[in-house]
Amino acid sequence: MKKRLVTLLAGLLTVLSMGFGLAQFSDVPAGHWAKEAVEALAAKGIILGFPDGTFRGNENLTRYQAALLIYRLLQQIEEELKTQGTSPTMEALAPEDLEAMIAELKAQPMPEPGMDQAALKDLMDRVEAASIAADTALAQAQQLAERLDALAQDVEGVKGDLAGLRSQVEANADAIQALNELAVLLNQDVLSLQDRVTALEKMVSGGQELPDLEQFATKEDVAAVQEFAAALRSDLVGLSEKVSKLEGTVGDLSGKVATLQRNAFTISGSLSLNYSVYRAWGPDASAAGPGTANTFDIDRLFSSKFSTGDGNGNGSVGDEADLGKNTEGVTNATLSVSFSTGKLDAASDPGKLNSYPGLVQFSLRAKLTNPGKYDPSTGAPTYPINLTLDEFSSTLAVAKDQTLSFSFGRSVRSKFTEYVFDNDYNSRGHGFVATYKPGLLGATLTGVYGSKGANNGDFTYFRGARLALSPVEGIALGGSFVQEGLDANQGTTSASFPAPTTVYGVDASVKLGPVGLAGEYFNSDAAPNANGYYVKADVALGSISVAGNYRNIGAGVTGANMLSGDATSTLDQGGWGGVDSSGNVINGAPFRSNRQGFGVSASAGLGPITVKGYYDSSTVLANETITNSYGAFNYSANNQLVAYGGQADLAFGGFTLSGFYRIAQLNGSTTRYILTEKPAEAVYASEYGAKLAHDGASKDALVPKLNFTAAYTQKYDNATSGFTTQDIAVYGSYELALGPLTLKPMGRYHTQDAAAASTSSDYTTVKYGVAASIALDLPFKPSLSGEYYARSTQVTSANSGSSATGTISESKYAVGLKLGEFLFKNSSVEAKYASYTGSGLNAPILLGVADAASSTTSDYLYNNAVSSVGSNRGSVTGWYFTWTYWDLTFAYVEADVNNNGNQTHGQAFKISYTVKF
């Protein structure tokens, strides 16, 4: 009996240790180490399993389930004891029997403690694995809970916004709902009364004796109820009328609001008042008097209210003069106002038979400068207001799915294709553009007409049309025609009428899944060979992409000949390509003119590895000479240009390791550079090497905010006809925040080592610097800033060239203090001091060449002398003070420039007030 009890308890504990619910039949795996125990307990009725026939061995055991198991076990034990004729309780035993049982137990050998060790170890492993899984699930659940909390907050915010939007609607809706509910109740009462009347009528018609109605209500009660019902009906009718009026009013107001939104009128602009005085003395100062110009730049020292900005649009402010002129105190006032509308409604006139919602939209600009003091007795002086109509546009829905829109004004722009009549960046002149969409075959018909350059006396007009079709998704077709020339015989007394310039073209594109195909043909009669065509194709399948092209762009394809004002870049043949100082594309023509050829490129990726390759071959159609920052390129007709190369990249942990090999050939011979087929300042080069780069902005960055590059390049040298020029560059930058202090150090090392027979020089540049700023949470809200940058270039050998050897140096330091709250709110004061020094420069220090002081990819600060020592030296030093209260600014600056020993001093004072509205 005792052994049976121990066996049953051991089996129960085994099941409990694994958690109740190992599968009874269907979900208990065959060969499971606890399968025998489960089946034994199930056979004895201790374990019954779940109603679906499963045991669920991986679920936890509840206290209720444990109580039930123990209860069934005790019942089983009692039954077996009773079967053996033994009392089921220990109380039924006599003391001598208990003593005998105790003696018998003591005499028996001790059983081995615990369970089988292998089973226990397996049990512990399973428990540990379950614990780890539970911990992981708990952590994931906590993260999910945090995300759900954040999402709940966002949802609550959105609910708040929606509640605010619904508040006005609900205010009226509640009142209307209450009226509706009252009407429903009244209708129910009426129906109930009708039912009662019908029942009474049946009783009367059937001869039944009516009940004593007096016990329910007297006549006076009935009369009172009737009077109340009549009053309610009257109120209901009145309320219904009010609701109807309210609904009509709401609908009318909604229509008026929609009309006001469509007809929104916006006025914006600015009023600028400036008083300024400029003084300068020294050899490089301008002569005194009105109309004199500044002579030297101070943007290299610090930003200021005296900066003339990027006047030439080359992306640099250091090459624009800010000080050095002499002018008396001058006050300038400029009022600029812009009027713009939403889409205004319109009606036909006369008769107003048809109305056109959202028909018209336009904008106006007005500018008035230096109005002067007005004398009412003479009406002088008077100043004209320059009123400019930027653009007037409208869209008319002429029929279902058909629209007609047109626009006109000074700023109207239009574009047919990249080669034909591309004038969407630079307006070609005053005129109008009309666009009709008939709603058939995805068609768009565009017409243009205008005066080139507005009223400039040349009497030249342009007119053109374009039809574009998109019959199905992914397929587009287009045709363009445009002319420009004299209109009638205006501007000439000649009896003969000169022929206009005519340009036309057709284009098409197809996109079917991963395959894309596009092409264009264009022609102009403005010059010989002013025509061309190209075809482009590309395929992308996963990480593999292939692109190819064939082009034949004539030498006469220029911006002027194609009536494309956006083709204004002077760097490239035909003036195609280029971007503005803000990075906006001026013209996106895909290929350079004066070329016939083809090209192909491909790339493939496999995990962290990417492989790229290209091949391009072209023939020069006519003699050309192009000069850019890479040098002068003199090509003759029928010259053959070939370029090919490959590159492999390996990305890991924010790093990219690259290896490359590139070849550029002219007439079959390798050369250092050839121009690419693209209309931009770009070249194909002959070189090979490797580069390791770390991107601090990458999510996988090993060190966030650390940008680092190490590059080795072996360059081809035309003088030696080999890869004899070695180039090594290591550079980087880092941004470090230490509480309120921010540090941005940078550094660059660059060396070039050419062969003795090369015309290139040997030089080494070391460049370094740091910018620091700190904002303190103290009275007056002070903040400090400072920066220091320097570079030293050693030109050690001219080799077989003409470069001058020696040292080129540049350095710059600046400090600044700003009080964000000076004396009172919205008042701030700032003081700066800075100095820039250079020697061995290739241009006078009066102006810079480019702004590259903090650039890690440039060898210089502001003067681009690198491979040869120049003869210029000097310095620019100055200080600047400004006080600002709202839009009122007082600014003062003094600066000294030492230009090759010639000392010039400049100073300026300015008061400015600008209001924007």
Swiss-Prot record:
GO terms for biological process: monoatomic ion transport. One of its GO terms (molecular function) is porin activity. Its main location: membrane. Residues 1-23 form the signal peptide. It comes from the Bacteria. It is a multi-pass membrane protein. The keyword Mitochondrion does not apply. Pfam families: SLH, SlpA_C. It is found in: Cell outer membrane. Residues 24-84 form the SLH domain. Keywords: Cell outer membrane, Ion transport, Membrane, Porin, Signal, Transmembrane, Transmembrane beta strand, Transport. One of its GO terms (cellular component) is cell outer membrane. Plays an important role in the structural organization and integrity of the cell envelope, bridging the outer membrane to the peptidoglyan layer. Appears to be a nonselective channel. Exhibits a tripartite organization, with its C-terminal part forming a homotrimeric 28-stranded OM beta-barrel (OMBB), its central part forming a long trimeric coiled coil that can traverse the large periplasmic space, and the extreme N-terminal part forming an SLH domain trimer that can interact with the PG layer. Homotrimer. This is Outer membrane protein SlpA. The lineage of its organism: Bacteria, Thermotogati, Deinococcota, Deinococci, Thermales.
